[in-house]
UniProtKB/Swiss-Prot annotation:
Location in or out of the cell: Cell inner membrane
Keywords, ordered alphabetically: Cell inner membrane, Cell membrane, Membrane, Sugar transport, Transmembrane, Transmembrane helix, Transport
Signal peptide extent: none
One Pfam family hit: BPD_transp_2
Species: Escherichia coli (strain K12)
Cytoplasmic topological intervals: 1-5, 64-88, 135-159, 244-250, 316-331
Keyword Cell inner membrane included in the entry's annotation: yes
Subunit structure, interactors included: The complex is composed of two ATP-binding proteins (YtfR), two transmembrane proteins (YtfT and YjfF) and a solute-binding protein (YtfQ).
Primary site of residence: membrane
Residue intervals annotated with topology Periplasmic: 27-42, 110-113, 181-222, 272-294
Gene Ontology CC, one term: plasma membrane
Family listed: Belongs to the binding-protein-dependent transport system permease family. AraH/RbsC subfamily.
Protein name: Inner membrane ABC transporter permease protein YjfF
Amino acid sequence: MIKRNLPLMITIGVFVLGYLYCLTQFPGFASTRVICNILTDNAFLGIIAVGMTFVILSGGIDLSVGSVIAFTGVFLAKVIGDFGLSPLLAFPLVLVMGCAFGAFMGLLIDALKIPAFIITLAGMFFLRGVSYLVSEESIPINHPIYDTLSSLAWKIPGGGRLSAMGLLMLAVVVIGIFLAHRTRFGNQVYAIGGNATSANLMGISTRSTTIRIYMLSTGLATLAGIVFSIYTQAGYALAGVGVELDAIASVVIGGTLLSGGVGTVLGTLFGVAIQGLIQTYINFDGTLSSWWTKIAIGILLFIFIALQRGLTVLWENRQSSPVTRVNIAQQ
């Protein structure tokens, strides 16, 4: 139990130490307003990262999620602005489309035995291209429901305002934790990530599980696209460029092994929080370039990947170490 939770404990420790350092430099970090702003600003990333956690836990990768955000935004902007469709109808419509696209990619991955990297890369280019066909310019979204959702928030002690977007992200994390650790689907994801051949021998349908994994990933990416469109009040074909890498970084920093089979959704939440903490510190400082966020995340990735490799080698050595047998008769 301890060895499997060690990456999570290290991630939480890094976040706590980082937060304490920020607090010593800028006492304003003690305000709940800062925490709420981190949740709101990173709500779409957190939602995507939950879906990416399941993908990486299964030993796969999903590079299409950034393009899903872009397509979701321009699609909503078009159908709401040009066709007068209510967001209450447009949201479920685009969610169904996103889930169907993920299911299709999952089917191709399992049926054709092509690496997920290739299939989702194709999906990334396809959706980005379709987004450009819809519109090359940013399309503003003007609708009362969007205005209501973007301003909806609840006051909490300390001067903070927990937005509906931040609350939705936390709800997705809670549901993700439940799915991963309290359902048959979660057990199947861990089993496939640990050893797909053994999972097959156990009677687990890898095709059905793979389809559901990628359907969940693109479904949550579509939900993140909805959140992002509410956050920006617009749809843009260039939205979400590089977000897939931020999501992967959050998952890895959160302690999920890239080889699959080990990791937690809770760790991913802290991975997202660490990225948000670094960005907020840079904003507070005012003298540092925003690119320092990428540099810091890159350093953390190097550290956590090296840590993952070290832990993996340690576990393999322990499992392969010979068992000392004691001859009772000789005693």
